[in-house]
C-alpha cells in the first residue's frame, strides 16, 4: 500500500531487499499518487511494475462518475500583502516614468480594494454552513499551528460561540487521545482538528464537513491528500474546502484536475 513511498531512500532500500528475498512473490501495489513530483517526477508504477497498471482512476473521474462528491472550493485573499509587495517591486523596476505612474495608480487602487475586503472571520461565517461540523485544519509546523489556534476566537466566533479545538502532531504524546476524541465528538460545538504532517495519507475520518488549508505547499501529492480528507465515497453533501493560502494558484494539479474531469 502507498507504493510511491518506495521511491524514498530508506523505504526503497527495504523494498529492494524484500523483493530479493521473495523473487517469486506476486506483487500488488496501491497508491493514489504514483508520481513523486518533488523527486524528479519519478513514476513508481514504471519503476516497480514496469508500467503494468491494472486499474487507474483519477480524482477528476471519481468526481464526474459520482463516486466522490463535488466539493465547494473557496479561496481567499488572506495573503494578499505578499502579492502586493511582489507587484510593487515590479512597478518600481519599470523604466518609463509614465508607465510606472499608471501602474502605480492601478496598484494603489487594488491595495485599497483588498484592504476593504472581508476578513477571515467573515469568510468563515459565510462559508461554514455546518456550524457544528468537523473540520481538519492543516498547518505548516508547531509555531504556525499555535499562531492559527490563537486566532480561533477571532475567526470562528461568528460561526459558533462554542469551538472545540483538537491538536494532532507526531511529537505530542496526547495526539492519539485528541484524535480519538475528535472522531467521537458529537456535540453541538464547532470541531476543529489542527494537525501537522498527519492525516495526509493512509487515514480517513468519516463525518468530516470540510478541510481548511493553512499550509502552503507546491507538492501536488500533499495538496491532493489534504483535500482528499474532505472527500468520502458515497457522500451526497458537498464538502467544504477552504484554501486560505491559495495553494491552487501554484499547482499544475488544478489544470490537471480540470482536464481529468473533461476527459471523464
Language-model features: where?
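SF2 helicase catalytic motif II
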Residues: 1-36
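A short beta-strand-to-loop transition that corresponds to the Sensor-1 phosphate-sensing loop
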Residues: 2, 30-34, 141-142, 196-198, ...
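Conserved Walker B
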Residues: 2-4, 199, 215-217, 230
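Short glycine-/polar-rich loops that comprise or flank the Walker A/P-loop
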Residues: 22-26, 50-52, 68-72, 161-164, ...
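Interdomain helical connector at the RecA1-RecA2 junction of SF1/SF2 helicase-like NTPases
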Residues: 39-133, 149, 153
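SF2 helicase motor core recognition
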Residues: 66, 192-211, 227-232
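Conserved helicase ATPase core of P-loop NTP-dependent helicases/translocases
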Residues: 136, 146-147, 152, 159-200
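Conserved segment of the helicase C-terminal RecA-like domain
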Residues: 229-257
Amino acid at each position: 500500500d502507498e507504493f510511491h513511498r518506495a521511491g524514498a531512500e530508506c523505504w526503497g532500500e527495504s523494498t529492494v531487499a524484500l523483493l530479493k528475498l521473495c523473487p517469486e512473490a506476486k506483487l500488488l501495489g496501491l497508491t493514489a499518487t504514483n508520481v513523486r513530483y518533488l523527486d524528479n517526477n519519478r513514476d513508481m508504477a514504471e519503476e516497480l511494475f514496469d508500467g503494468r497498471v491494472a486499474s487507474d482512476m483519477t480524482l477528476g473521474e471519481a468526481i464526474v462518475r459520482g463516486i466522490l462528491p463535488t466539493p465547494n472550493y473557496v479561496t481567499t485573499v488572506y495573503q494578499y500583502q505578499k502579492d502586493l509587495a511582489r507587484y510593487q517591486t515590479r512597478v518600481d523596476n519599470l523604466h518609463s516614468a509614465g508607465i510606472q505612474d499608471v501602474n502605480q495608480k492601478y496598484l494603489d487602487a487594488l491595495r485599497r480594494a483588498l484592504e476593504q475586503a472581508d476578513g477571515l472571520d467573515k469568510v468563515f461565517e459565510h462559508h461554514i454552513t455546518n456550524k457544528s461540523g468537523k473540520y481538519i485544519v492543516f498547518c505548516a509546523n508547531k509555531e504556525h499551528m499555535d499562531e492559527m489556534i490563537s486566532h480561533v476566537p477571532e475567526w470562528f466566533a461568528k460561526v459558533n460561540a462554542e469551538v472545540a479545538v483538537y491538536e494532532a502532531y507526531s511529537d505530542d504524546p496526547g495526539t492519539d487521545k485528541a484524535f480519538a476524541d475528535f472522531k467521537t465528538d458529537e456535540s453541538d460545538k464547532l470541531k476543529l482538528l489542527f494537525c501537522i504532517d498527519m492525516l495526509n495519507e493512509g487515514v480517513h475520518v468519516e463525518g468530516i464537513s470540510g478541510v481548511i488549508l493553512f499550509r502552503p505547499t507546491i507538492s501536488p501529492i500533499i495538496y491532493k491528500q489534504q483535500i482528499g480528507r474532505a472527500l468520502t465515497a458515497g457522500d451526497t453533501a458537498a464538502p467544504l474546502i477552504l484554501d486560505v493560502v491559495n495553494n491552487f494558484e501554484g499547482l499544475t494539479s488544478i489544470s490537471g484536475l480540470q482536464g481529468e474531469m473533461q476527459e471523464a
